[in-house]
């Protein structure tokens, strides 16, 4: 049974198990030994991080663990998560590591790993690494300890890769863009790329202090960017999260468009151009029913997966699809990247604005969403509220309330101690009734 790894690596509150310096040291040694055993390659690892205060602590602890098993460590500094996947392949490394808790607040942090192909590790690999963390590993002899050095141009190399994914010669002249970098990993890279492409850039969320990542800004708080778009008379807003693997778009009126709308736009365009591989989009069970209907009307399939961009990527690789993502804003374009890339997806949206000549408000409403309601219930460590008979009964009753006119989804979050209760239904009264009844039952089970 997996105890350390969730749906996106290891994550938790800094200085609380499992996110302690001691555990990071042990994880570094275990993953180093695993790749010394498996890769038989250059024994090289790249490490990136976002702007959290605890990132320095975990960077040093992981580096020590990795070097102790003979891995040579290349430190990239603050870079977006997709840059780590890129640099792992570009530098022919055996392993890539990103230190980030993505959209979570500053007190949290996490560690996620990429294999030599730039893709996240498999469940099987993570389970084996967990076993090695528990049992301990053999360290390298003194003369075989790994070397450590910094790589100064990682963000520039990433920026060039992002720009190369766009239509050759594309420029954003005349486009006024608010870009919210969430005080995170892309706080320098995103404004620079937009400026290089000719946009009139209004940067916000670009003053990280180690504690303000995702605080009142970024993709999980688009209100800040929405207000900035309206105040500056901008044409569009691009909101990233702390590690820049998510994107949310704001139109010129201040309206927010999630990942479903962005995926709908890109899928329809790619299908029209004959470059949507497999004739389908890959998305998770959280994507809106309206997206499914929109795609179906255009002869485009929808492949649904469990929640988590890693499962989207796995299905894309299995089925030969090249476009996928999540409602939360992870957009995966596998022709250009191995994981969700918020900045790249945002730039492709801007490219569609320039190509079509349409305002952002026209492009962000590709379909009318079916009313959707999502509520979360927090639980304590060791609790299993979904196993309670009262909760199971409430779920059955809620499904009866919807009676085939909508859908109900209840799941445990893979990154936080939350039970997520989501439903969709055209009848908003039934929708609210169904969700609230389950939320109440789960909350009662937590308090029991």
From Swiss-Prot:
Keywords: Isomerase, Magnesium, Metal-binding, Phosphoprotein. The keyword Hydrolase does not apply. It is an enzyme of class 5 (isomerase). It comes from the Bacteria. The keyword RNA-binding does not apply. CDD domains: GlmM. Its cofactor is Mg(2+). HAMAP family: GlmM_B. Catalyzes the conversion of glucosamine-6-phosphate to glucosamine-1-phosphate. This is Phosphoglucosamine mutase. It comes from Ruegeria pomeroyi (strain ATCC 700808 / DSM 15171 / DSS-3). The gene is glmM.
């Amino acid at each position: 049974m997996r105890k350390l790894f969730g749906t996106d690596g290891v994550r938790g509150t800094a200085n609380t198990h499992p996110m302690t310096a001691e555990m990071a040291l042990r994880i570094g040694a275990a993953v180093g030994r695993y790749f010394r055993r498996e890769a038989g390659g250059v024994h090289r690892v790249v490490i990136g991080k976002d702007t959290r205060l605890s990132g320095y602590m975990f960077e040093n602890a992981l580096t020590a663990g990795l070097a102790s098993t003979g891995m040579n460590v290349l430190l990239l500094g603050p870079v977006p998560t997709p840059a780590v996947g890129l640099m792992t392949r570009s530098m022919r490394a055996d392993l890539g590591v990103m230190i980030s808790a993505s959209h979570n607040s500053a007190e949290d942090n996490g560690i996620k790993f990429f294999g030599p192909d730039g893709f996240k590790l498999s469940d099987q690999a993570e389970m084996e690494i967990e076993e090695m963390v528990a049992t301990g590993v053999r360290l390298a002899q003194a003369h075989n300890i790994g070397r450590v050095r910094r790589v100064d141009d990682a963000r520039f190399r990433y920026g060039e890769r992002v720009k190369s994914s766009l239509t050759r010669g594309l420029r954003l002249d005349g486009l006024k863009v608010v870009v919210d970098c969430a005080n995170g990993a892309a706080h320098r890279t995103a404004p620079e790329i937009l400026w290089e492409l000719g946009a009139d850039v209004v940067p916000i969320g670009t003053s990280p202090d180690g504690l303000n990542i995702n605080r009142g800004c970024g993709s999980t708080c688009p209100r800040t960017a929405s207000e900035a778009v309206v105040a500056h008379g901008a044409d569009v807003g691009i909101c990233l999260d702390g590690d820049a693997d998510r994107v949310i778009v704001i139109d010129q009126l201040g309206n927010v468009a999630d990942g479903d709308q962005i995926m709908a736009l890109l899928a329809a365009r790619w299908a029209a151009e004959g470059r949507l591989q497999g004739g389908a989009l890959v998305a998770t069970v959280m994507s809106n029913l309206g997206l499914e209907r929109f795609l179906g009307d255009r002869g485009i399939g929808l492949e649904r997966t469990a929640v988590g961009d890693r499962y989207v990527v796995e299905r894309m690789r299995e089925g030969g699809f090249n476009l996928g993502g999540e409602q939360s804003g992870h957009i995966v374009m596998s022709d250009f990247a191995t994981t969700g890339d918020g900045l790249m997806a945002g730039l492709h949206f801007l490219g569609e604005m320039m190509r079509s000549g349409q305002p952002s408000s026209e492009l962000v409403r590709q379909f009318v969403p079916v009313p959707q309601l999502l509520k979360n219930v927090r639980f304590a460590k060791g609790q299993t509220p979904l196993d309670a008979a009262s909760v199971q009964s409430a779920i059955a009753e809620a499904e009866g309330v919807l009676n085939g006119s909508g859908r109900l989804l209840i799941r445990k979050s893979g990154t936080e101690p939350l039970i997520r209760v989501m439903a969709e239904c055209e009848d908003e009264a039934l929708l609210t009734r169904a969700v609230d009844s389950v939320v109440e039952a789960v909350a009662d089970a937590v308090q029991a």
